[in-house]
Amino acid sequence: MVYSYTEKKRIRKDFGKRPQVLDIPYLLSIQIDSFQKFIKQDPEEPCGLEAAFRSVFPIKSYNGNAELQYIKYQLGEPTFDVKECQTRGATFSAPLRVRLCLIIYEREGLNNIIKNTKEQEVYMGEIPLMTNNGTFIINGIERVIVSQLHRSPGVFFDSDKGKTHSSGKVLYNARIIPYRGSWLDFEFDLKDNLFVRIDRRRKLPVTVILRALNYTTDQILNIFFNKVIYEIQNNTLYMHLIPERLRGETASFDIAVNGVIYVKKGRRIAAKHIRQLKKDKISKIEVPMDYIIGKVVIKDYFDKNTNIPIVTANTEISSDILHNLIRSGYESIETLFSNDLDYGNYISETLRIDATTNKFDALVEIYRVMRPGEPPTKEAAEYLFENLFFSEERYDLSSVGRMKFNRSLQRVQIEDLGTLKKDDIVDVIKKLIDIRNGKGEVDDIDHLGNRRIRSVGEMAENQFRIGLVRVERAVKERLSLGDLDVLTPQDLINAKPISAAVREFFTSSQLSQFMDQNNPLSEITHKRRISALGPGGLTRERAGFEVRDVHPTHYGRVCPIETPEGPNIGLINSLSVYARANKYGFLETPYRKVQNGVVSNDIHYLSAIEEGDFVIAQANTNLNSIGEFIDDLVTCRNKGESGLFKKDQVDYMDVSTQQIVSVAASLIPFLEHDDANRALMGANMQRQAVPVLCSEKPLVGTGMERAVAIDSGVTVVAKRGGVIKYVDASRIVIHVNKNETHTEESGIDIYQLTKYIRSNQNTCINQRPCVSLGELVEHGDVIADGPSTDLGELALGQNMRIAFMPWNGYNFEDSMLVSERVVQEDKFTSIHIQELTCVSRDTKLGPEEITADIPNVGETALSKLDESGIIYIGAEVIGGDILVGKVTPKGETQLTPEEKLLRAIFGEKASDVKDSSLRVPNGVCGTVIDVQIFTRDGINKDKRSLIIESEKLKQVKKDLSEELQIFESALFDRVCDVLMTSGIDKKKLFETSRNAWLDLVLSDPEKQYQLSQLTKQYFDLKRMFEKKLEIQHRKITQGDELAPGILKIVKVYLAVKRQIQPGDKMAGRHGNKGVISKINPIEDMPYDQHGIPVDIVLNPLGVPSRMNIGQILETHLGMAAKGIGDKINFMLQQHKEANQLRRFMQQAYNLGEGSRQHINLNSFSDIEILKLAKNLKKGMPIATPVFDGATEKEIKDLLKLSGLPSSGQITLFDGCTGEAFERQVTVGYMYMLKLNHLVDDKMHARSTGSYSLVTQQPLGGKAQFGGQRFGEMEVWALEAYGASYTLQEMLTVKSDDVNGRTKMYKNIVDGNHMMEPGMPESFNVLLKEIRSLAINIELED
């Protein structure tokens, strides 16, 4: 296996046995591909914006004299880059310009002749752009558009499962769902009549819509029924026989032909009778005359003499009618065939309750349902019906809907029109009747073949189309009313409706969400999330159990583990690792093709619809060296069921053992040993892990860590290979390999690192280089780590030495005892950055002012502010400190003469303003790390703004000049190469200035051409950097676009350092969560025979009932990994030779049977071996992939190799007494996470504060600075103790006795600790409520 530069530094031992046939796909492709499709310009296959424009344009005027045509569109360049948009609170978007052509016609006779055309480029608003990491910056905030799982358009057959009526009768229904347009429902009622509903309105007999489609009664009956022909010969009635139709009937007469009795009267007609009739080729039998009585005629019969109707179609034959038919000379009578078993006469019965008789009546009936109260006219009724299902403007099944529709009706043709046709409606009714007759099955609505993914591009296109349709109406009106000779396309188009529709979607849609940026995993998971909620989806209140449940088709497409706990369970899911959406939006998963029992490496992606036809083997099926199945019977899946199949029946095999789970679940080692509920918690809690100061890779991982870290975008990845030419904390420069460099470029790649940026969750984003000067890197190598990554691997927590044992009750109920060493070494210390904003507005009384001159504030409070009233960078602040001084004008009050005199004597300042400064919130303390000031355009900037501006300009100039120097240096190196190969002496060359080199004239024309090209590049480079500097200068010095009424915004960024403390929540990766109960001194912690204390003590009772045994296996394997590291460390300390280290590490890497990982350390140089050993001395990282992990034997072997007991248990000694514990204890290394549920964010203290308006009781919750509720049960507790005075105090002066608490406050100030309880306000409220019921209660003194 070839390792990249970063991987060589620290190779993770892989215990996986199954070969990795398919690489993990790019994890953000669902977002990025969808948006690329949205903005892709492809006239051949229009999609996204192109499709939206084509569906609305051309727009014709009502009179047909003018037409506005679409030619093409173009997206401009964004004004600000991503970082600038985040700082300024702007949207990262590009202007959309559309080229339109206005054609004006002149009528000549019946034809229109083009009189004039005007072509123009029109601005149509801004389109938000996706960043490289699949997010959008909207108003400076990073957001994610979550994909939606919704019911696919098409036709669906369903039943009520007998729940509608008390009789339990199953009522079947069909629904045609378009992508856009009216829904069409067909449903049976209790009497087996068939009805239709349009858009869930009042139901109509189904024959109404058939008549509206211009079918007559005869045609309707002929479409839905087979006919039976009776012949009358010599007063004898004969029936044309089709034997199959008799199956299951009871003979009401002897069925005999030529004296041979086939079935006796009263006998049930069975299969043997039908076989005999067929064998003897009986096609006609004699039946009694009364047999035809009650049968329904299939067409009209008229008197042959008078032409008066004897019987109309769909009428039952009576003896009189039969007599008239015979008398009129009819020799054959046609009736419709039906029976009670499998040919119901539902349409015939429905025709009888249908009051309409022709097309017009039917159209009027539909019009009355759709437009109740409006008088119907023939034209209006026809127009409405035509527009409902047959107009491309109003109705669209879409290619997906048509494909599903045709598949459901077993049609050969997959794609067709987007509107409905007559045959479509008839075929749906036919299939529904067949299902009612017991032929065919209803659809499973939770099958992933019936639910599709709607991603960001598609949703944005729909929203854009809504905006375009609004514009279309306005354009039509303007074309009809305006003077066409003067109008231009620009005059016709108003971009505001389009911008508003797009902005509304990105800012306020339920699926446009504030990105979860806790750590790289939470970012990736959020982008791969699939929600069944949102517009056009389900609501959590109405969603039942079935839709939330795991479905067999979820296999390899949607993760069965990762879903939230609570009301959204099962409605919000996560995409599986290898899943992708196909062109129709259905989820596909990859499989290896199996041919004649041999598994190939040929990969096929199958959707849930296609998968149902195949037999699919699991990924952990045993194969021999050439890919044949070892076992004759193989466990496989087919049509949603698992079973054993012969190996030659298998069609496909899973690609990987982890293809069933999502990214988060695939990061849990030994997932196969955890209970599903705990695995769900583990997957969810990894997303809440806070990035700590020093990230540490997990000793026991799954091999997915690198893919997640790279795809999340938090690391910096080398775009091209080369040599590290320069590296510092904020910049990495790579001199690119010659074979990867184009001739017309400098061959230098500069990577700027992100430093101490605030994330959406207030965690700190900081990138650190992980390469050194002069090192070689290749394309795709990680060159800088981001938050929660370590050498290019995801590192959410820390490896902790843990012991499973009780310890003085401190680990009761999932609590954890943590060693002081963890705090001292800052293992779980994290930095949180808070953004506090001060806004200066223009009020009615005058503008608010940001100043250091604040009334009634002492000098000490102002000591950290500069003269502009803004805090210094680097200031240490605590709760209540002023960050930005601001005064707001208040209404002038009338002063008494005494006050005027005092004002004149003492000169009290600023009486007409009040203090509205920005202060540090209570309970927060930290360091000011940055201040940003935004001033409205046209307002003079204050001194601090100008200082910040000059610093920014200085920094930009420095960065750009350094970049220029780097590029110049590389360019002059190439110039030097050209000159030296031309024979110029190196010594002479370096005696002249570098700029003079460009003026030299060479004799060789080819070398002269190369020199002139490099000279051109040099001057282009200079020009480009000057232009860059000019653009940056303009951006920095220009005023800011602020909302109306806002003059200035000051943003202060505080960095808060949070050490771990009791009350903080921690968790492992197996759903084993708990709260820290105590930080224990190191000397009191249990320790082993070598004197090494444990870091965390966990409760062993937390394992058996939770059934997450994975944590125990992780602990043992972690111990073994650390043991290997300790041995390597010992060898390094002993200065052993590289060969000895190589042999030992090779032995460790080779351990395990049938491992897919083959490492040859002989190919590593001694320097690489030493570097690898240094990185392994804290423990050898191990990968144990899900469902393909390390076995118990392998863990024991690794423990033996590291010189540890194979039981994984050791004797511990009590740190307090020094005595050994009676029994051995499981000790090992577990990867622990600090979750973003910190006690500092949850706890607060209140003495006085705000009160509820009605009850006058203190508010609740930290956000309201509320108090702790003393509830009913707490009152009982005090009653039980008989603490009456304490109880009285709690219920009166400490709660809602307004007068009592005011007196109490005064008494405390006076030093008098007496209280006088009065009447609680809540009692007064109770009195008022009783009085509102007209019961008067008065209190006696």
Curated annotation (Swiss-Prot):
Keyword Transferase: yes
GO biological process, one term: DNA-templated transcription
EC category: transferase
GO MF annotations, alphabetized: DNA binding; DNA-directed RNA polymerase activity; ribonucleoside binding
Pfam family, one: RNA_pol_Rpb2_45
Catalytic reaction equation(s): RNA(n) + a ribonucleoside 5'-triphosphate = RNA(n+1) + diphosphate
Cellular component, GO annotation: DNA-directed RNA polymerase complex
CDD domains, alphabetized: RNA_pol_B_RPB2 (cd00653)
SUPFAM superfamilies in the record: beta and beta-prime subunits of DNA dependent RNA-polymerase (SSF64484)
Keyword Nuclease appears in the UniProt entry: no
Keyword terms, alphabetized: DNA-directed RNA polymerase, Nucleotidyltransferase, Transcription, Transferase
PANTHER family in the cross-refs: DNA-DIRECTED RNA POLYMERASE I SUBUNIT 2
Chain's role: DNA-dependent RNA polymerase catalyzes the transcription of DNA into RNA using the four ribonucleoside triphosphates as substrates.
Subunit structure: The RNAP catalytic core consists of 2 alpha, 1 beta, 1 beta' and 1 omega subunit. When a sigma factor is associated with the core the holoenzyme is formed, which can initiate transcription.
Similarity section: Belongs to the RNA polymerase beta chain family.
Protein known as: DNA-directed RNA polymerase subunit beta
Chain's gene name: rpoB
